[in-house]
């Protein structure tokens, strides 16, 4: 979808201009202020002129076919305005009005459907309804409903904002804290979607970072295609996803379905494509502005040096760094010796550094320390403690001068100014620091959370990821059927997933035949696709050492199951080799409605839903990604050897994950869920074994 006429219109008509407070007034004033005024036209049938400009009675009277029509009328008038504009040949529109499909009424939905039909008929790109509009600071286009405060003369790369909440997006865009290049409020987003805006920003050179307030998706394929391109370009995307809390999938047929909800699915997509996911607006704005100011000059590694003016600040830095998984650089002895050249005699050269109150006024000391850390390869970036309040201050004047001088002398590594507390920042200091690629971060607590997220982006390597994505087909029905354990294991074995030796007995004679080739001890289990949790109905007997015990177990299982589940269809009794126990892991598949099959791995056995130590990842998956998943688990210590225990066969476990993922991805339109639980993981070199298996398919 080309958005050229919407984003860079040469001519604009504003329908519904008024001098009363509201969108019709603010849009009229801000658009005229931003554009060449002889190609902006007011339309109001009841007024001859407004704000010193002629008003046309209808869109047909406007002396040219405009590129974009901005509709400021009540909702019931919107379709006719758009239809008239479309018939003239206008190819873009912005609709601010609410009361359409978001209202949840038949009338509102019908009105929105009319807009969609008009868009299709006239090939018109309609932003909205129920939106705040569009801002393009690069080409001086202000179609934002809420004002005209932005610097529309910039040609500097900045932040591309996309939001699905009008109010939240307006708050973000209106902040003095942001260097904005573009702003999109997509509203209901059924015509020009959030995905369309992101797609544009990924390829635009003036959007150095993309910041998205995301509620949901219309087109997952287009969204992920854009994320993939951004990952390959190393363009940061920051997303604040709303609706992260979940009550769970009550009707899920397996453990995996219970654990994997839409919020986790989104987070797993973000991880795969290198998206920076944030939890609140403070992190969102802090990171977006930091990436914008750095403009591609990112740290070479995520270890940092800290320059503060008190021991208390150093203690806070050290604590927050450890809590957030951010590493203080292990500076070399040569670095420490060179630091002594610039520090007062009573200061100790170390990291974090208490530079004493000399930090307030010793410009040359700051310049020297920055260059010293520049030469130490262990240091990826430097942070300087600086409470840059909304007032002039000697310390911050010194810092501004020092950074400017250091940059002129060739300083390359990133520098961050880190206040202890949140607050307004003195504009002159902020401008001077940012001109020298020094972001002023948020409060120190938020800063270290942001450093952690920035470190993950720095360390992200798309070449180690499988970025392939194909959206699942829309299903007409979500009815499912569970395969029996026997059939599930047969499917798994075809893809090379190790399972125990097994057979299915429907009689004592068949039991005897199976016991001829499966050695004792054995396990007997009920084999029924209608009984998912066998132990709950007395359907499992383990440690069977001879034929007499096997016959007794066979009969007892049938008795137990018929009593607990009298209506269940029984396919027989599964006779299974009793394999040696190992560390119990669950590996599963859940098929997300938007993103398709995802692989889950975690601590397994009967406690899987108690501890919920799991991680989720989109398919397909390779060996490197499988290892990454395992390392995220709290229980990875058990796999890696803990308190004298032998390390487990992690490579074999990762190999099983890849094979299960291959099966699920190749059959994604058929498979809803899979549970391999437990999977026994043996010591290194001894392999793995899926002891139990459940596959749930769509009918």
Mark where each language-model region is.
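Catalytic-core regions of core metabolic enzymes
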Residues: 1-675, 679-699
């Amino acid at each position: 979808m080309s958005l050229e006429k919407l984003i860079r219109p040469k001519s604009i008509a504003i329908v519904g201009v008024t001098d009363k407070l509201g969108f019709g007034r603010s849009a009229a004033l801000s658009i005229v202020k931003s554009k060449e005024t002889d190609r902006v036209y007011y339309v109001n049938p009841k007024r001859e002129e407004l704000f010193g400009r002629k008003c046309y009675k209808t869109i047909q009277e406007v002396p040219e076919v405009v590129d974009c029509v901005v509709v400021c009328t009540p909702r019931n008038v919107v379709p006719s305005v758009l239809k008239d504009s479309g018939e003239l040949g206008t190819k873009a529109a912005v609709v601010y009005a609410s009361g359409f499909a978001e209202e949840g009424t038949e009338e509102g939905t019908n009105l929105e459907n009319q807009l969609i039909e008009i868009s299709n008929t006239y090939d018109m790109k309609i932003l909205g309804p129920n939106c705040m509009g569009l801002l393009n600071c690069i080409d001086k286009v202000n179609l934002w409903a809420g004002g005209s405060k932005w610097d529309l003369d910039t040609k500097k790369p900045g932040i591309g904002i996309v939001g699905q909440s009008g109010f939240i997006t307006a708050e973000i865009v209106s902040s003095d804290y942001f260097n904005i290049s573009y702003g999109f409020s997509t509203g209901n987003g059924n015509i020009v979607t959030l995905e369309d805006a992101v797609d544009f920003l990924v390829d635009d050179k003036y959007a150095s970072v993309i910041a998205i307030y995301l509620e949901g998706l219309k087109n997952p394929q287009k969204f992920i295609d854009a994320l993939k391109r951004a990952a390959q370009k190393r363009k940061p995307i920051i997303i604040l996803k709303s609706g992260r809390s979940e009550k769970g999938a009550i009707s899920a047929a397996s453990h995996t379905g219970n654990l994997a909800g839409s919020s986790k699915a989104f987070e797993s997509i973000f991880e795969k494509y290198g998206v920076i996911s944030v939890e609140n607006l403070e992190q969102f704005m802090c990171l977006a502005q930091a990436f914008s100011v750095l403009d591609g000059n990112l740290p070479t590694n995520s270890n940092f040096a800290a320059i503060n003016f008190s021991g208390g600040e150093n203690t806070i830095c050290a604590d927050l760094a450890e809590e957030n998984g951010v590493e203080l650089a292990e500076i070399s002895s040569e670095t420490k010796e060179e630091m002594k050249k610039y520090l007062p005699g009573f200061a100790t050269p170390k990291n974090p550094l208490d530079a004493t109150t000399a930090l307030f006024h010793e410009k040359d000391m700051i310049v020297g320390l920055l260059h010293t850390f520049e030469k130490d390869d262990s240091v990826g970036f430097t942070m300087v403690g600086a409470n840059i309040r909304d007032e002039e201050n000697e310390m911050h004047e010194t810092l501004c001068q020092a950074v400017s001088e250091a940059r002129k002398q060739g300083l390359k590594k990133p520098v961050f100014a880190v206040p202890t507390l949140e607050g307004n920042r003195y504009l002159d200091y902020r401008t001077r620091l940012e001109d020298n690629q020094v972001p002023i971060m948020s409060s120190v607590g938020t800063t270290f959370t942001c450093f952690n997220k920035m470190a993950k982006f720095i360390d992200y390597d798309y070449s180690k990821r499988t970025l392939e994505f194909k959206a699942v087909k829309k299903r007409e029905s979500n009815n499912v059927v569970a395969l029996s354990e026997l059939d599930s294991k047969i499917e798994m074995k075809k893809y090379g997933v190790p399972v125990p030796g097994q057979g299915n007995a429907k009689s004592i004679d068949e039991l005897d035949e199976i016991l001829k080739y499966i050695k004792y001890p054995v396990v007997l289990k009920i084999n029924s696709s209608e009984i998912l949790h066998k132990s709950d109905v007395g359907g499992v007997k383990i440690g069977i050492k001879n034929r007499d015990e096997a016959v007794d177990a066979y009969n007892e299982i049938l008795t137990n199951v018929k009593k607990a589940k009298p209506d269940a269809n029984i396919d027989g009794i599964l006779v299974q080799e009793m394999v040696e126990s190992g560390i119990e892991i669950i590996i599963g598949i859940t098929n997300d409605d938007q993103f398709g099959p995802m692989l889950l791995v975690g601590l397994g056995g009967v406690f899987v839903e108690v501890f919920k130590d799991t991680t989720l990842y989109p398919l397909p998956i390779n060996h490197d990604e499988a290892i990454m998943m395992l390392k995220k688990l709290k229980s990875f210590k058990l796999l890696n050897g803990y308190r004298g225990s032998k390390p487990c066969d992690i490579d074999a476990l990762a190999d099983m994950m890849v094979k299960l993922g291959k099966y699920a991805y190749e059959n994604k339109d058929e498979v809803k869920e899979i549970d391999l639980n437990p999977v026994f993981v043996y010591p290194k070199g001894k392999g793995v074994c899926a002891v139990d298996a459940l596959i749930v398919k769509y009918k």
